[in-house]
């Protein structure tokens, strides 16, 4: 049996139950820095970002009610680092619903937004947004020229994804310049759009993300508007650790010196850096030999959670 697929078979039933349970459990330069490393942490990176600010400038491209379900596809504006990004979102909810629990359903690498109808049929209001910016699709998030690093097909389009190095090869100096920050900011803006829907109960918001959607789920778990998250096949420990095969149980253990850009990324942007600051009830699922990240470091991530 393919071990990657085994958890997926049970995921729909399990994730639904998990989100219900988890929600019930959860009633530029940076002035501040981590005392030990003198590097910024995720809360410092995000303290000046307001995901609610500015007009959505909603442009509805599809709207219908069918078989008792209301559907809406629309573009909204996200204001990030001085740029206006047009984010494509899909929304569905039972027609006439009131005070419905809200769900952010976040897609994986190179994928696109999709509504999980199992949740809609069970009474949830579901929002799914595009952050990959794949332009071959009829509708996709539109990154301006200055935000070309948001396109997952950046290389094909003449851009570069930004992690611990800038496109010119220099070391990362500003965490907000990374692709990861951009995708997280877009996600938080889409959450604001979900909360703006009349059918949604803002006190009951959950989110689940698959693969890279699970990877950026760690940041969303820090957002106080979210009560519960599920991250599956998105575990972090990619930059530096997977990139350089720095496996925890290498024998002998080998760990090349980290560059300044890697140190900054790992402190301020990496998914696992968010663990000590997550306020949402959290569930994490992953295959024991999933190549996506440093699965063997799961214990370190859990140890970092608030007790």
Spell out what each predicted region is:
Residues 260-274:
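Active-site nucleophile elbow and catalytic-triad environment of alpha/beta-hydrolase enzymes
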Residues 13-27:
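Bacterial N-terminal signal peptides
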Residues 88, 98-108:
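Short beta-strand element of the alpha/beta-hydrolase
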Residues 188-253:
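Primarily recognizes the serine-hydrolase "nucleophile elbow" in alpha/beta-hydrolase
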């Amino acid at each position: 049996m393919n071990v990657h697929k085994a958890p997926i078979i049970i995921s729909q039933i399990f994730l639904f139950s998990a989100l219900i349970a988890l929600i019930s459990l959860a009633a530029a330069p940076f002035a501040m820095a981590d005392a030990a490393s003198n590097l910024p942490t995720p809360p410092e990176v995000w303290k000046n970002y307001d995901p609610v600010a500015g007009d959505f400038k909603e442009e509805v491209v599809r709207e219908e009610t069918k078989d008792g379900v209301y559907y809406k596809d629309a573009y909204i504006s996200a204001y990030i680092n001085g740029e206006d990004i047009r984010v494509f979102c899909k929304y569905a909810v039972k027609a006439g619903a009131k005070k419905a629990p809200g769900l952010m359903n976040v897609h994986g690498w190179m994928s696109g937004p999709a509504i999980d109808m199992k949740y809609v049929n069970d009474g949830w209001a579901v929002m799914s947004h595009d952050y990959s910016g794949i332009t071959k699709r009829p509708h996709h998030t539109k990154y301006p020229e200055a935000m070309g690093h948001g396109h997952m097909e950046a290389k094909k389009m003449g851009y570069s994804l930004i992690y611990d190095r800038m496109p010119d090869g220099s070391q990362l100096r500003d965490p907000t310049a990374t692709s990861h920050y951009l995708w997280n900011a877009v996600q938080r803006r889409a959450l604001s759009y979900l909360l703006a829907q009349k059918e949604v109960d803002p006190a009951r918001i959950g989110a689940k993300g698959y693969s890279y959607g699970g990877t950026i789920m760690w940041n969303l778990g820090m957002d106080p508007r979210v009560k519960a998250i599920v991250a599956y096949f998105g575990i972090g420990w990619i930059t530096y650790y997977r990139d350089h095969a720095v496996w925890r149980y290498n024998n002998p253990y080998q760990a090349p010196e980290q560059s300044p850009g890697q140190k900054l990324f790992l402190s301020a942007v990496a998914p696992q850096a968010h663990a000590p600051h997550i306020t949402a009830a959290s569930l994490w699922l992953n295959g024991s030999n999933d190549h996506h990240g440093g699965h063997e470091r799961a214990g370190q991530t859990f140890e970092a959670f608030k007790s």
